[in-house]
Curated annotation (Swiss-Prot):
Gene3D superfamilies, per the entry: Helix-loop-helix DNA-binding domain (4.10.280.10)
Assigned GO CC terms: nucleus
Occurrences of domain bHLH (ranges): 114-163
Coiled coil: none
Name this polypeptide is given: Transcription factor BHLH133
InterPro entries cross-referenced by the UniProt entry: bHLH_dom (IPR011598), HLH_DNA-bd_sf (IPR036638), IND-like (IPR045843)
Keywords associated with the record: DNA-binding, Nucleus, Stress response, Transcription, Transcription regulation
Protein family (similarity comment): Belongs to the bHLH protein family.
Entry keyword annotation includes Nucleus: yes
Miscellaneous section: Plants overexpressing BHLH133 are hypersensitive to iron deficiency.
Disruption phenotype: Slight reduction of shoot length and 2-fold reduction of seed set.
Length: 198
């Protein structure tokens, strides 16, 4: 009989502890709370055993309640941290994109600067070669140093045409005797052009 009442008391104290854990906050819990049948038992060993059981179960209950409150707070804090971490991640992502963009722009600028410098180097060399050729051409053309570049180029074109005509006349069997006349007329025309420019 004592066994069955002991089991009933244990079951009842477990239920009480469970109900305390569900409904009461830690300040409202009373570890000595029990049923009337629990208070009627007066055996010291049994009483200390059940009191320890009730105390341990309520402590478990309080721990459970504290854990539930902490987890709710942690959830709130976790959500705040999650939002904060999300915004920080977005900021870091944006910053890394900006850094990548700046790096690619700077690389492109360096590449374009080097390309521009190489292009300017080639353009400078090209201009130097053109100027050298123009000086040589000025020396070959009669009165080429006395006129501007555009006039000198026109005279050079006329002079080249004259030279082609001379080649044709000298290479043909019938017209070779007229070559000196063509030379004189071509030469006179160049001379007249240079006089008109001065």
């Amino acid at each position: 009989m004592e066994c069955s009442s002991f089991e009933a008391i244990c079951n009842e104290s477990e239920m009480i502890a469970h109900l305390q854990s569900l409904f009461w906050s830690s300040s409202d819990a009373d570890p000595c709370f029990g049923s009337s049948s629990f208070s009627l038992i007066s055996s010291e060993g049994y009483d200390t055993m059940t009191t320890e059981f009730v105390n341990s179960s309520t402590n478990v209950c309080f721990d459970y309640q504290d854990d539930s409150f902490v987890s709710a707070e942690e959830t709130t804090i976790g959500n705040k941290r999650k939002v904060q971490m999300d915004t920080e991640n977005e900021l870091m992502t944006n910053r890394s994109k900006e850094v990548r963009t700046k790096m690619s722009v700077s690389k492109a600028c360096k590449h374009s600067v080097s390309a521009e410098s190489s292009q300017s180097y080639y353009a400078k060399n090209r201009r130097q070669r053109i100027n050298e050729r123009l000086r040589i051409l000025q020396e070959l053309i009669p009165n080429g140093t006395k006129v501007d570049i555009s006039t000198m180029l026109e005279e050079a074109i006329q002079y080249v045409k004259f030279l082609h005509l001379q080649i044709k006349l000298l290479s043909s069997d019938e017209m070779w005797m007229y070559a000196p006349l063509a030379f004189d007329s071509g030469n006179n025309r160049l001379y007249q052009n240079s006089l008109s420019q001065e």
